[in-house]
Amino acid sequence: FDAEFIYATHLLEQAEREGARVINRPAALRNHPEKLAIMEWPRFIGPTLVTREAEAVRRFHAEHGEIILKPLDGMGGMGIFRVGPDGLNLGSIIETLNHHGATTLMVQKFLPEIAAGDKRVLIIDGEPAPFVLARIPQGSEIRGNLAAGGKGVAQPITDTDRATARAIGQALSARGLLLIGLGIIGTRV
């Protein structure tokens, strides 16, 4: 929980009432946490689990074989782990990320398309920009984040990515989120 973020959004609301132009509505920012907001669009995401329960993570791993585990409050690729079909070190990773059940984490089926990059789509008032920034993992990394050493490459947006970004972007624009970035791996958000 980031109390400073909450305070900042309340201060931005006050600034807005006093006449300042605020691009993204502060309440909308509070109500759409980055990683959880995607759960509203299951048709655009790969298999995903949000839980505190270690046993639920183990069942998800057994079902999907190769998974990604990440903290809900992480950024820049920090705290992201890949676990292969053998489950090597899964217990330790779960303990590290969820502090023995105290912290909720996200688990997703591994998408091998990450090798081609995690595409960042810029959406302005519901409309995606014509180009994306593909953040491509380097070396033995699975993280494409620039902060984790990924290489950024501009690419034209695909028709599929445009349709996905437009569907999500228009819904979020109606809620006051006018400037957003959407991450897409392969065809999945």
Predicted regions and their residues:
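Phosphate-binding site of ATP-dependent enzymes
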Residues: 54-55, 62-66, 73-168, 172
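Short glycine-enriched loops at secondary-structure junctions
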Residues: 26-30, 135-137, 185-188
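Structured loop/turn residues at beta-strand edges in well-structured enzyme cores
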Residues: 43, 62, 177
